[in-house]
Each structure stands twice: as structure tokens, then as C-alpha cells.
């Protein structure tokens, strides 16, 4: 008899293997699957495993030239999603040999490359990935990580403060540098290029880099603190991006920035390697993430994009505020904040963490809280994010009625007051407003900020629920 039989057969015969014991070297994925009406969940889960590994839509004779059992993805468990009709979590195990070492690009091309357009599925979302130790070890990861950054900046025991320079588009380089200087002089640790500031006609990158470097050095000399500005090196080509990073290094500034989703993982990993080799910190902005992660039943959850960034490399990444103008539910946000910072994270479904993740000492990433936050949020932010974070107030600094430097002073005073109160054992969640009010008695800048923003709230329900 001939070993090869042409024709189309059910995926579940080959790719649904509930008896499979996962290996320590497997990459594990949890997908939220919404099958088309009439498609059984086992078939849908198996289809995902097949299409994201070795399968194709029909039997091919070349299957006989390899060992499918060694290379195929396997759907090893399926569970219904509580409270949702015809939605399932499908767990898929991928053998390590399917992936190129040290390439987030290849990992994503395999796992989420083709399968999301699959007709048998109404919707598909990648909820979480377990990256095995053996694969983690093929990545450099963040250029420096949390501890090295603190040592470089000589700042300990508190969150770091930042500010995005606004208006984000239209300032000349000289005026932009002036705004940077005012913020840093007032007491911020960092200022930031907006994610869409690259090199436009009103402000070319080289001019901006130069004036920002001048602002940094002037502010450092006046305050005796180390300062930084996230110089956005994102560009249309990798060569141009590297040219900008090299110029930043020549200026002697401490940190550059990249938009990792629009710039792409290949560019990001290249830049991260350069940053480690040349002592630059790397700030990562997640522009475009909501296109991918905001829909509850289709796309990729941000915790996966956050894990991917830790592998590709970045020292800071924007990760929601829980309290400001942008999306973020508290437990889920803290779940991926832990995935960014900690070395070992236990599985915890209540926070959306589907797998235990061991990073085997890959450096951690500082989460950046940014978007619609101001001094009244400071106690909550200090309590939620703790010391290892960057709190970024754009409008919450520049919108101060007396200008940028007083806005920066207000934020720094509020932060120091919250850290001191916490260290004295006070409850920031309960006494937060009182702590800010007390501090504003001896800081007119803070008092003015408190007055301006006392009524501002962004109250909408979070979409990112379990």
C-alpha cells in the first residue's frame, strides 16, 4: 500500500492531542478562540495549532520527508470561557525547533503570522505566551535593566519623573530645547520626545538632538542631578535610525527612544544591541498597540507584546496608568507590569497570567505610566506602581498656570511627599488627597497645580477585563 493518501482531513486528527505532556522547552500559547457556528472547538483549536506550525489545508506528499511528530504544534487543552457563548481558550504547545534563536520577529511570524485570517474562526486572540528558559537565553533582552539604570542615574528609592514635551508637533528645535530645559531644571528626571516626533520639516532630528543635549547639560549643572531626554531615533530605515542613535551617543546623552511596534521588532532588537554596546538607555513607546490589543476577542493582548519587548530589548516601556486618560484595568495592568519587572512570575488567572514565566535573570523593564495624569493622581500612582516605574506627566507639567519649571516643581514635590508618607507608613490609597494638600501648604507651585486640576477626571469603564 502507498504511504501517502491525498485529500483533506480534519485537523483534529493530527493536531488535537489532549494526552500530550508539555515539555520544558516548548513555547506555550493561550488563544481565545471564537469558532464559526458549527465548527467544534477541538477542530478550531487544532486548526490554530496546525496553521501556526507545520500544517496546510491538504495532505502533501512532502509530509513524508520529515517527522511531523517532532515539529508540529499541538493543541493540548481546551476550556470554555466563563460567561461567553462559544468562546474557548485553546492551549497550544510549539516545539522549540520551529523558532529561530534570538528573533522575536520569527516567533511572531510563526505564532500569529497567518492564522488570524483563518475562515473557520470568527475571531482569535493571543492571550499569553510561555517563553521557555532555553529560548529566553537566546535573547540579549533590555540593554541595561532597572538596577543598572538606577546606578547610572544615581537615583534610588522613588519612581522617576518624566514629561512629554507638548505641543508635540510644530515647535522649532530651539524652543523645544528651551521647554526641555525648564522641565529638567524644575526637578524632573527625564523629558520625552513625543512618539510622532521623528524628523519633520519644522524640526529636523539633528537640530533637536543638539538643542536637547544643551538643555540636559545646563539643567545638570544647575541642579547637580543627572538628567535625560528620550531622543526619538525612530526613522524610515534601520540605517537612518542607527545614524541617529550614533549621534546621540556622540553627544554623550544618557538615553534614546524607539517606537517598537511601528518601527518593528527587527529594528528594535538592532537598536537594543547597539544601546547595550554603547551605554545608552533605551526608552520604548508602544504607538499602535491599541490597534492590536484593544479588542477583547481578536488580536494580541498587551501582556504578550510586553513580553516580546523584554526579549527584543528596552529599558522603559509605556504600560498604562490605571488612573489617567488611557486604557488599563488595575489587576491586569499590574499583571503585565510584573511580567516586565520581575524575574519569576507565577501563573495567576485572576490577573490574566496564563503561564508561570521564568526570565532567568534577563534584565527587567521599567513600566512607564503616561497619559492624562496630574498631581492629584500621584498618591495612587506611587501606590500602584511602586518605586520601579517612570511617572510621566505631559500636560500635567506643561499645563501648569505658571509655566514648565513650576509645573515640574509641583510634580517633584508631590512625588517626594508621597514617597515620604509611604515610608512613614501612611496609607496612600486612603490619605492621598490629604498628603497632597499638606505638601501644597509649603509649595506654592503645587498649590497652584492642585487648584487647576482639582476637577479633571477621565471616567470610562475599562475594556481590558478578563
Swiss-Prot record:
A biological-process GO annotation: reductive pentose-phosphate cycle
PROSITE patterns assigned to the protein according to its UniProt record, in alphabetical order: RUBISCO_LARGE (PS00157)
Binding site for substrate: 114, 164, 168, 286, 318, 370
Site (Transition state stabilizer): 325
Residues where N6-carboxylysine is found: 192
CDD domains on file: RuBisCO_large_I
Recorded GO CC terms: chloroplast
Annotated signal peptide: none
Modified how: The disulfide bond which can form in the large chain dimeric partners within the hexadecamer appears to be associated with oxidative stress and protein turnover.
Keywords, sorted A to Z: Calvin cycle, Carbon dioxide fixation, Chloroplast, Disulfide bond, Lyase, Magnesium, Metal-binding, Methylation, Monooxygenase, Oxidoreductase, Photorespiration, Photosynthesis, Plastid
Amino acids binding Mg(2+): 192, 194-195
Enzyme Commission designation: 4.1.1.39
Record note on cofactor: Binds 1 Mg(2+) ion per subunit.
Task of the protein: RuBisCO catalyzes two reactions: the carboxylation of D-ribulose 1,5-bisphosphate, the primary event in carbon dioxide fixation, as well as the oxidative fragmentation of the pentose substrate in the photorespiration process. Both reactions occur simultaneously and in competition at the same active site.
HAMAP family with a match to the protein in the record: RuBisCO_L_type1
Family statement drawn from the similarity comment of this UniProt entry: Belongs to the RuBisCO large chain family. Type I subfamily.
Miscellaneous notes: The basic functional RuBisCO is composed of a large chain homodimer in a 'head-to-tail' conformation. In form I RuBisCO this homodimer is arranged in a barrel-like tetramer with the small subunits forming a tetrameric 'cap' on each end of the 'barrel'.
Subunit structure: Heterohexadecamer of 8 large chains and 8 small chains; disulfide-linked. The disulfide link is formed within the large subunit homodimers.
Protein name: Ribulose bisphosphate carboxylase large chain
Gene designation: rbcL
